[in-house]
Amino acid sequence: MLTQLKTYPKLLKHYEEIKEVHMRDWFSKDKERASRYFVQLESLSLDYSKNRLNDTTLKLLFELAKDCSLKEKIEAMFKGEKINTTEKRAVLHTALRSLNDAEILLDNMEVLKSVRSVLKRMRAFSDSVRSGKRLGYTNQVITDIVNIGIGGSDLGALMVCTALKRYGHPRLKMHFVSNVDGTQILDVLEKINPASTLFIVASKTFSTQETLTNALTARKWFVERSGDEKHIAKHFVAVSTNKEAVQQFGIDEHNMFEFWDFVGGRYSLWSAIGLSIMIYLGKKNFNALLKGAYLMDEHFRNAPFESNLPVLMGLIGVWYINFFQSKSHLIAPYDQYLRHFPKFIQQLDMESNGKRISKKGEIIPYDTCPVVWGDMGINAQHAFFQLLHQGTHLIPIDFIASLDKKPNAKGHHEILFSNVLAQAQAFMKGKSYEEALGELLSKGLDKDEAKDLAHHRVFFGNRPSNILLLEKISPSNIGALVALYEHKVFVQGVIWDINSFDQWGVELGKELAVPILQELEGHKSNAYFDSSTRHLIELYKNYNQ
């Protein structure tokens, strides 16, 4: 456990020594701070100079990582050891994008051979849709793709297709359905033509309640309009491992794309779950996405901790969570194309590390994953940055931006990028009472009024942030960015001694929903309901009589 590691008391002592130091002082004393605390991997870079740390902090954090055998655990993951201990599974999302020739054997399966076989089928299928060779039941080309999934079968594909819209096929419109509410699927069905729509049903077991409910609604709508169930074969494909259930649905087994237990949902966009991505972007751009992730994989596996991007970000996060007692972490992308990135990282981070039981089954006596949240930065400035600047919470921030200007939008990117730099500087530097008072007096305010108002215009600063810069929003850079966060999550899971690759926390609510659903549908359940739940069940039933 973290608190039992030999470096932990050293970090506690060091924290007490520097907790009141202001970053302004470090910057004023060290003119090389920005260049020293900067790491670049091809066209992705990290400026971590605006963090409340110094060389001693980093040295101790690297020692902490060594205490946890981080290097050895990284290797264990890449080699296919069953590090998902509660489910007795390997964790090999890295194999989905591997360019290595060295085969990985897992329970007598040749992993890379299997992965590349599925990729080959995905490429052939996506080519047929994009080229117009694959036609609908009236011989129309496919114009709309509807991806039906939830969680990891939705968020990754949605995020990537949105981020890389400039690379998408101009004929294809992408739609993503995850919510079982009914509104979302009905809204999508209103917009599309059954004769030119391809539905992708993404569910490993092909039994996920939300996904199957939406898929059956889409199926019913399609059959009513096409007039014959046989047309399902041309318009529905599945990403699943349950061949029997897929065939019962009416989907041809040749239109089923498999994936494996060694790939968790939130790590699965590189697999057949990314079929919608490949269809939209094409195989060349999908390959670039994989290549960017592989580049980050190799960096994570081989770079020394001192210049290792995921290791640095993971350890810096631990520094704030377990020593500064930070409870929250903000993701602030300054790019409209990255608007879904925060909620993708929410799932990746919180479903992986939102746990309080160690690998040995013991209750952990320290904080683990913070609340991860965010929005597009420029909008957030006018919504909740007030709290970040002058509120009572210490909330570290990841600013994410690109250097590349958008075409046909002169002056826009300069304004956007200036705000990234200004916000990061403001969070670090702040504004003292004396500075605020001087500004007010220079504007001609009465001295007594200025003294009172100046208190409200103080920014304490010393608010930490990372700045992640991409040269441009491209497939390879998005691949590298996602892999960076995947590995950062892994690093923190190792430090906290938790299994980052199960998600038992999603199960209890699903189990309890079964008897409640029986009651709502008019059937009697033998389950016990607390008085609140029973009252609300009756309220619903009475309203809908």
Curated annotation (Swiss-Prot):
Query: EC?
Result: 5.3.1.9
As one GO molecular function, the record gives: glucose-6-phosphate isomerase activity
> Its Gene Ontology biological processes?
gluconeogenesis; glucose 6-phosphate metabolic process; glycolytic process
Q: Which reaction does it catalyse?
A: alpha-D-glucose 6-phosphate = beta-D-fructose 6-phosphate
What InterPro entries has UniProt attached to this entry? G6P_Isomerase, G6P_Isomerase_C, Phosphoglucose_isomerase_CS, SIS_dom_sf, SIS_PGI_1, SIS_PGI_2
Q: Which domain of life is it from?
A: Bacteria
Any GO CC annotation of this UniProt entry: cytosol
Catalytic center residues = E351 (proton donor), H382, K510
* Gene3D superfamilies on file: 1.10.1390.10, Glucose-6-phosphate isomerase like protein, domain 1
Task of the protein: Catalyzes the reversible isomerization of glucose-6-phosphate to fructose-6-phosphate.
HAMAP family per UniProt: G6P_isomerase
Stored PANTHER family: GLUCOSE-6-PHOSPHATE ISOMERASE
Q: Member of which family?
A: Belongs to the GPI family.
Instruction: Give the NCBIfam families listed for this entry.
Output: PRK00179.1
User: What's the protein called, per UniProt?
Assistant: Glucose-6-phosphate isomerase
Protein source organism: Helicobacter pylori (strain J99 / ATCC 700824)
Name the gene for this chain. Answer: pgi
